[in-house]
Structure formats: C-alpha cells, structure tokens
Amino acid sequence: MRLAEVVRNTSETQIRVKINLDGSGQQKLATGVPFLDHMLDQIARHGLIDLDIEAHGDTHIDDHHTVEDVGITLGQAIAKAVGDKKGIRRYGHSYVPLDEALSRVVIDFSGRPGLEFHVPFTRARIGTFDVDLSIEFFRGFVNHAGVTLHIDNLRGLNAHHQMETVFKAFGRALRMATELDERAAGQIPSTKGSL
C-alpha cells in the first residue's frame, strides 16, 4: 500500500493529511470549510483514494488560507505516497458530466509544476464558497505534488455542477495517473530515466 501522512503548521493554518493511494474511497474530512469537504469527498470517491484530512484555519477572516493550504498539503502527501514514480502510469485524464456541465482534467506526474485552469464559473459564490478559491487549491496542489494539470470546464450553467465535475474528473485522472502498470513494473515512465 502506498500511504503518506503530512502535517503542515503555519501561523494561519494547522493541517494534517493522511492518504492511501490504493484505497477504496473512504474519507474522513474536517477542514472547517463545508463545501471544500464536499469537493474533497469527490476526489476520494472517484479517485478511490482514502483521505483523512483535518484542518484548522483562520476562517474567521475567510477560507482562502485553509483551502490553499489543504491543496498544498494534499500535494505533498500525494508526492510522498507516489515516491520515485516507478511503475506508475504517469498520465491520467477524465471527462465527467453532471447534467448540463462537462469538465475535462488531464494530469502528468512530470515533476514540473504547471496549472492551466479554464473554468468560466457562472457565478462568484456557491453558497458561501468563493469559486476563486478552487484555483488556489489546485495551484497549491500542483506546486507541491510536482505535476502538470490541465483543467477545462467545457460547458455548464450551474456553478455547483461546474465545480463538482472538475473535482470528480480530477479524482478520476489522479487515480489513472497513479495506478501501477504491471507491464512497466519498476520502471520510471520517462525516456530520461527519471522524473
């Protein structure tokens, strides 16, 4: 099993992330940001990754630091669990619909952080959740997981549906990229010999 635990403590947040990449989608989520918990649940269930995330942050100011730092810590945990990347598929992609919304996510465990985020949300908030925080979550994730990530919402009228398709597709792409390929067991998935 590929397990990892990362703790991040700053003056703004205290976060603990435990993951099992070879899990069944079990989750225990307590970030203090209910909509973020809902989206993290999508990653766990659709990625079949067991997630245990606890966060305490300065949400009395706003949710920005908590959301961003959960992304950072999750990225660190994924990188730790993947390790040297031997035998993984490296690339993953997924299209996910939800009613009128459709999103595509493509990920590469290249070791080169990069984010292309193209989601034209139809409103600025989903309940109390500022949709701009989703890009902060993913930026924190890519910078600390060392991945290239392309996120495109291809269509959608309902911002909740747009966001949910993004997180579901992300979970599925993550699962595909981190799966072990028995035909490439013990090999680094790169012509360079390292990632």
From Swiss-Prot:
Localization of this protein: Cytoplasm
PROSITE patterns according to UniProt: IGP_DEHYDRATASE_1, IGP_DEHYDRATASE_2
Tagged with keyword Signal: no
NCBIfam families linked: PRK00951.1-1 (NF002106), PRK00951.1-5 (NF002109), PRK00951.2-1 (NF002111), PRK00951.2-4 (NF002114)
HAMAP family associated with the record: HisB (MF_00076)
Family recorded in the similarity comment: Belongs to the imidazoleglycerol-phosphate dehydratase family.
Name of this protein: Imidazoleglycerol-phosphate dehydratase
Record gene name: hisB
